[in-house]
Design a protein with these regions (language model features):
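Non-catalytic structural scaffold of enzyme domains
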Residues: 1-74
Length: 74
């Protein structure tokens, strides 16, 4: 039997908990890491380059820390 997957859910604002709830419903056996970026909210007030400059390194750090099998950006 294989180990349950680890799923990282990155919430960029509103709606991430709804996404997480649906994923948990589909995969109740998985391990979860949920991270909300409240400090940069709302993302709509930032330009594309600014968002990329923030999110790419942050997701990289989260992947290194949690070693997920799947990353969901909500």
């Amino acid at each position: 039997m294989t180990a349950p997957p680890t799923i990282l859910v990155f919430d960029s604002g509103l709606g991430g908990l709804t996404v997480l709830r649906e994923i948990v419903s589909a995969r109740p056996d998985a391990h979860y890491a949920y991270v909300a970026d409240d400090a940069f909210f709302p993302y709509g007030h930032h330009g594309e380059d600014e968002i990329i400059a923030r999110v790419v390194p942050l997701i990289g750090e989260l992947i290194a820390a949690h070693r997920p099998d799947l990353v969901v950006i909500a």
